[in-house]
């Protein structure tokens, strides 16, 4: 895997002109996706919180521009060849010996992300022993922070969850987040999972009152350096992915804005999105990443609760019978937090 996920934490100072809690919702994943482009020494909490404060509410999808950047571990996965990176690292170590450990941690995070990506694409289990032996090696004392950052990268950028399958051997597998079944992995993009982009798009739509304009989606994606018409190492050609593939897969719907000339489009969730996940699960995903809970976003939380109740009522109406009343109630209760006072 090339070396440039590091540039994706960079234009974070821009942000979204949206309600404060909605900024926090999408800012969480944008910050993490950008962190697949910043420094290993940066703490997740400082990089996640409060990163999206204002993005111009007007305008059309942006194009790449040069700007000053701060950059981090997972982020470096896409840009610089390893030999160039190593030469730069050695030069930096000579100038600042204190930076050597941070550079080592950053490199090990990138190596572990590459290792985990191969395991995901080949559907092989992962053990702590092989991570230590094959990747971490003599840096075993630093395994916990390296593993934490690599896991965070896989979760946010690639949209994967790690599930333990054998507590004795510490064996785990990587699965797609939020119970999504989308698995479009093409040979020309090395089979990288695209669930992370799908989840981020769901978050933007939820933030935008359940229907996001194409311009708003690109505003957010441009922040993490995903541009319409620019092939991305992870996501392929993103305009095609969003406006055609995800629409064909029924994760999104594409609706032309009335009386728009030239035509403009907006995107709500599609029927497959509603069938496979819920607003509450999307909200909980972003909340977990930010180190908070869903009730930290009260307006979105209340909307997600209503969505849970409506789905429970639909089960009752469809299936009928008093015995299903209790199971539907239990399902709604187990998949959401208790309502705050």
UniProtKB/Swiss-Prot annotation:
GO terms for cellular component: nucleus. This is Putative MAGE domain-containing protein MAGEA13P. It comes from the Eukaryota. Disulfide bonds: none annotated. It comes from Homo sapiens (Human). SMART domains: MAGE, MAGE_N. GO terms for biological process: negative regulation of transcription by RNA polymerase II. InterPro entries: MAGE (IPR037445), MAGE_N (IPR021072), MAGE_WH1 (IPR041898), MAGE_WH2 (IPR041899), MHD_dom (IPR002190).
